[in-house]
Structures are given as C-alpha cells and as structure tokens.
Amino acid sequence: MAKGQSLQDPFLNALRRERVPVSIYLVNGIKLQGQIESFDQFVILLKNTVSQMVYKHAISTVVPSRPVSHHSNNTGGGSNNYHHGSSPAPSSQPQQDSADAE
C-alpha cells in the first residue's frame, strides 16, 4: 500500500461500510452527493439515484455528513501515522520573542 493511501483507504472504507452520506466536491466546483458504494486506487463509485464513477484525480474534497471513526481498527497501543484530530491546546497567553519585545 502506498503511503498516500494509508489515510485514504481507511477513511473511504469507513464511509462505505457505515453508508455515510457524503458530498464530493470536484476540482471544477461541482458538488456530488451520495453514498460510497466502492472505491479503488483511481476511482470512487458514488451511489445516489444512479451510480457514478468519479475519478479521484477530479476530486477536491470529500465531506461526510457526520463524523466517522476511520481508525477504530487500530486496537494496539502503538502509535500510527493517522492524525486523530487532537492537537495541543493553545496557550492562554500569547508568547512573544525576546527580540520582538521592546
């Protein structure tokens, strides 16, 4: 599996498995809506009233209608390369470089 697919595949698979409605925005600005029926390295099959084959190179953004957990299959305590969405809380006071203080 290519490194670029290590986030893509679990995310898309969770959307497919849980039948989450998605909005897919294409690079030309068109918005498609439906459920991910299946996907491979190059395309996503999007099902609404009809099934559409959407080439991944034409996709700008995939927006789920609700949050999904795409890393739940990682039961080990070890770290992985997935970004879990948590980041350190910002400091309550702005920090200033000593060179900037006057």
From Swiss-Prot:
Q: For this UniProt entry, which segments traverse the membrane?
A: none
Q: Pfam family example for this protein?
A: Hfq
User: In what residue span(s) does the Sm domain sit?
Assistant: 9-68
In terms of superkingdom, the source organism counts as: Bacteria
Gene3D superfamilies for the chain: 2.30.30.100
**InterPro entries for this protein:** Hfq, LSM_dom_sf, Sm
Q: Which GO terms describe its biological process?
A: regulation of DNA-templated transcription; regulation of RNA stability; regulation of translation, ncRNA-mediated
Keyword field: RNA-binding, Stress response
Q: Which SUPFAM superfamilies match?
A: Sm-like ribonucleoproteins
Its cellular-component GO annotations read: cytosol
Where is the sequence biased in composition, kind Low complexity?
70-102
Q: Which cysteines are joined by disulfide bonds?
A: none
**PANTHER family from the entry?**
RNA-BINDING PROTEIN HFQ
Q: What is the protein's quaternary organization? A: Homohexamer.
Family that this chain belongs to: Belongs to the Hfq family.
Q: Tell me what this protein is called.
A: RNA-binding protein Hfq
